[in-house]
Structure formats: structure tokens, C-alpha cells
Amino acid sequence: MSVAGGLEYLEKLRDFFYGLAELRDRLKERGFTWPRPYPAEGVAAGTVKVKAGFPAMLRNGVIMDVTNVEQAQIAEEAGAVGVMVLDKLPYDVRKAGGVARMADLKVIEEVMSHVTIPVSAKVRIGHYYEAFLLQEIGVDLIDESEVLTPVDDQHHINKWLFTVPFVNGCRELCEALRRISEGASMIRSKGEAGTGNVSEAVKHFKALYRAINELAAAEEERLRDYARQCQAPLELVALTARLGRLPVITFAAGGIATPADAALMMWLGADGVFVGSGIFKSQDPRQRAEAIVLATAKWDDPEAVVEAQKMVSERAAMVGIDIKTLKPEELLQTRGL
């Protein structure tokens, strides 16, 4: 179709939709009630289908941690599939110490009003009411996160009580299965947030898939033993073994700071990546955001990843933290069961 023909077609399409809108308004004035085109239960908010389906739409994408509208707009312009609003970036949480809590609701709402991509926010492990508040203001995804200070070390939120999908972190398969059994619609690796060091995320993803591969070759009795060991439903263990992966979308997170880091995690089996401090604690956030988005989407194309890596400079990257220098009590990944 020529350019002129395409424009003519778009004009006709516009006139058609305007005509439909006028017809709708006239019928409304006459008191016409619109019939439901599909059963309500098929699209009801909060169903497993809806809560698991939303994260599936984010595959091969990047969700970026942000603390304000300006950062959120940079993320959107770079091609991020979503933003995660925090009070402080994980690197700053680690440096500041003290109690890390949910971001200000006003800041979250301000971000929601300025970007068109999905907006998520973190809550403290076990803090039901932070989660209820985020659901009330209409966030798209809630992260029950070890980056914030837990209010309950022994019990996570029962996510079946909410209509908004949740994401939780894990270090290995048992942890992931417990979170899914609690209602998590999405899983991510914990890694070690705020370090700019991807080594822990790599370790967690390898542990996750090593266990899944072992289950895939296991007999039924072994699956029963594993379910008891993990304190997870046998049906969930069996489904994971049959699929050869977790039955929910699984993102990588924790220390991703370069396009190569993102591509590595995708190669290890991630469906997408969360990037925390790696972008906005660098000296080239806009270019780095674009480069990580490109490397994540095109991770299986070496030429594209080379192009992405050339977009950033190692000299501009955030100053990383060697995991070995952290004391046990400084590790964020150990929070939660």
C-alpha cells in the first residue's frame, strides 16, 4: 500500500470510530443498556488467570527501580516495560541503614500520572497493610521485597487475598515454590541488591534450574519427598517438574549493572530482568537504560548485545560491592523464609 493509500485508509478508520462513538452516545441518551460481550468470571479482577497473565506480558523486558518522576520518564523513554517505585535505590538503602519502608504514596501516584507503562512498588515482607494501600491506589504489581526491612521474618503475605499480582524473590526452588503457593504471580531471583554484583543472581538462577532439572527426571516418590521437604503442595512440585520450569514468569534481579549482565541472566533462563541501582547510580543512566533494554530483548543476538555493550562505558558504571566483604547481617537475600 502506498503512503497516500495508507493515509486514506487511516482517515476512513478514524471516521468509522467517530461514527461508533456518536452512535454509542445517542443510544446512551435513550437509556440503552449495553450487553456484556463475555462472561464476567472470564475477566474478573484478581483471578489467577489475570494475575498470572499480566506478568506474562512483560517477558523479554526490563523493569527499572526509580525514586521519582524524572527517573520513571527516563525508564519509559528507554523502553522499559515497567518501573518499580522506591523511597531509595537499593544501593542507598544499604548505605543508609535503619528501617527501609514503602515509598511515599504521593510519589507513587505522581509517577503513575506521568508514565504510561505499568507502575509497581515494594512492600515490606509480611506487611499486609502496605500492600492493601498499594492495591487501593491502583499499582499494577506489588513486590514483597527483602530490600525493605521485614516486619515478619517468619511469615510472608498471603497473596491470595489481593487482586493485584505479587512478585517475590527466591534463592532456590523450595523458596520459589513456597512463594507461589502463597499466591505469588511472578518470581525473581534475590541476588544481592544494591551491590552492582550479579554473581549472587547467577548463583540463584543456577540453583533454581539445577533443582528443576533434577525433579524433571525424578520418580513420583521423590516428588512427594521434595514437596514435604519444601513445605510446598505436591501438585505444584509435580507441575514444575512436568513443565521443566516454574509455572509463573521468572525474572532475574540483584546486581545487574551492564547489558552483558542482563544478557547473561536471559541466557540462564530468565524471562526478563529487574534493574535496581545499576542504572541510576551510574554516570550514564539514559544510555545505560537503553542499552540494558536492548541487550535483554535481543539477548540471543550477539551482534545486538555487542552494540548494547558499546553504548555504555565501564568508567561510568556504578561502583560495585564485593559480596565477600559483606558481613552476614548485611546480606539482604537472607531475609524471609
Swiss-Prot record:
Question: For D-glyceraldehyde 3-phosphate, which residues are the binding ones?
Answer: K206
Give the positions the UniProt entry annotates as the active site. Answer: K122
Q: Does the keyword Lyase apply?
A: yes
Query: Which family is this sequence assigned to?
Result: Belongs to the PdxS/SNZ family.
The record's EC number reads 4.3.3.6
Name a Pfam family for this protein.
Answer: SOR_SNZ
Which spans of this chain does the record mark as coiled coil? none
Q: What do we know about how this protein assembles, alone or with others?
A: In the presence of PdxT, forms a dodecamer of heterodimers.
Catalysed reaction equations from the record = aldehydo-D-ribose 5-phosphate + D-glyceraldehyde 3-phosphate + L-glutamine = pyridoxal 5'-phosphate + L-glutamate + phosphate + 3 H2O + H(+)
GO BP annotations of the record are: amino acid metabolic process; pyridoxal phosphate biosynthetic process; pyridoxine biosynthetic process
> CDD domains per the record?
pdxS
Q: Which SUPFAM superfamilies match?
A: Ribulose-phoshate binding barrel
Q: Which organism is it from?
A: Pyrobaculum arsenaticum (strain DSM 13514 / JCM 11321 / PZ6)
Protein name per UniProt: Pyridoxal 5'-phosphate synthase subunit PdxS
Say what the protein does. Catalyzes the formation of pyridoxal 5'-phosphate from ribose 5-phosphate (RBP), glyceraldehyde 3-phosphate (G3P) and ammonia. The ammonia is provided by the PdxT subunit. Can also use ribulose 5-phosphate and dihydroxyacetone phosphate as substrates, resulting from enzyme-catalyzed isomerization of RBP and G3P, respectively.
